[in-house]
Amino acid sequence: MLRYSNPGDWVLDQFMGSGTTLVEAKLLNRHAVGVDINPQSVSISETNLQFQCESKSKIFIRNGNATDLYFIKDSRIDFICTHPPYANIIKYSKGIEGDISLLAVDEFLSEMKKVAEESFRVLKNGKMCAVMIGDVRKYGKVIPLGFRMMECFLQAGFVNKEIIIKEQHNCRSTDYWETQNNNFLLLAHEYIFVFQK
């Protein structure tokens, strides 16, 4: 956020979860829009943002779908910083319509293409979009979800400026003994793709 935005800029996180991006935006004097399909995430984010600081940031939180940001006009956002769920790995709701965490990989990528198109629409020309995502393992095989999702953003019109590899410390997504029994290595990294419009 420090690298790709300035005080007073508008930041978007369309998979806001508990509101971490919005908290950072508030602390760094950026305005922010947070969107999540899960009403519980909206409530948690609202609670997490109830702190005082010197910032005069405007923070807007909305229960909605990242594939349809109709309430944001074209080319209004200065920076997108988001971390979508990983196709059917951790379910973030119990059947909320439009929750992409419930989808199989191909359906997930189809929805991420819509997310990429909406991101391109709302972002100002020349501005950056940072998306963090990792690969997944299904039935003992690695699915390169990160790079497949990257293609969605490239097809939407973005240019890839950076690929940052973020190491996951204390990775607990797969139990150590399970890796020993099934003879595979942990996926202990995520990607941060930085795209430019």
Residue ranges and their predicted role:
Residues M1-K197:
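Class I S-adenosyl-L-methionine-dependent methyltransferase catalytic core
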